[in-house]
């Protein structure tokens, strides 16, 4: 399977690329779109929602939650991996349906998400912080680069006699690392490379994509439907292949543009 580059036919169209909601594991689900990944984690005592997607596809997310047998009010926490709109625009409408839910973001993105979207996070996490909901403890790792406050998320998930080591790179996009991008900040490439190195030390055998093109979410969903006996999301090498891809992709663009750092 060739992985990672996004599909051009839906690039830039947040309302396109609707995916049927599905279970990655029995307790880990996808309810997003091709353009904006959204995951639900069933902790045994409510749901954790990782990112909320765009405002104009929020209806699809809500329908997806119900279609999988949950209710929006089951959401106890909303994790924002970084402040960009494709990850946070759905936060405010989600809170109207889950008013008791607590919002969570990385310490260096909290001001920006408030300035841009009026979201005042309930919990601001820093490197190595943990948060327990139900039976699951989530660990946050600061991985700046895509934004200065990007956080990646790791947790162990027990199911069917096995414990899965689940991980998500909270901001893998490389466009923001270059000066022609509105979200570029000085030092972002160096931060990004350091983040990649840190992430390589994590143990991950179930990689959740921060976007579908991070791990070919859509193709894996189709493969699971065709053969439910094999779960293509379970792969002890894929996370590291993706990190290598990210590193090479940035280095190649730097070379093309004559950049040394």
Predicted regions, residues:
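Acidic/histidine-rich helix-loop elements
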Residues: 4-5, 11-17, 52-55, 116, ...
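C-terminal regulatory/interaction regions
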Residues: 236-261
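Short, glycine/acidic-enriched loop or turn micro-motifs at the edges of active sites
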Residues: 30, 45, 54-55, 85, ...
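Loop/turn elements at helix/coil->beta-strand transitions in domains of secreted/extracellular proteins
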Residues: 46, 73-76, 99-102, 136-137, ...
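Divalent metal-coordination and catalytic microenvironments
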Residues: 27, 41, 51, 82, ...
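Metallo-beta-lactamase
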Residues: 54-56, 130-132, 137-241
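Active-site HxH/HxHxD metal-binding segment of metal-dependent hydrolases
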Residues: 28, 56-59, 66-130, 239-242
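Conserved beta-strand hairpin/beta-sheet module of binuclear metal-dependent hydrolase folds
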Residues: 14-68, 152-174
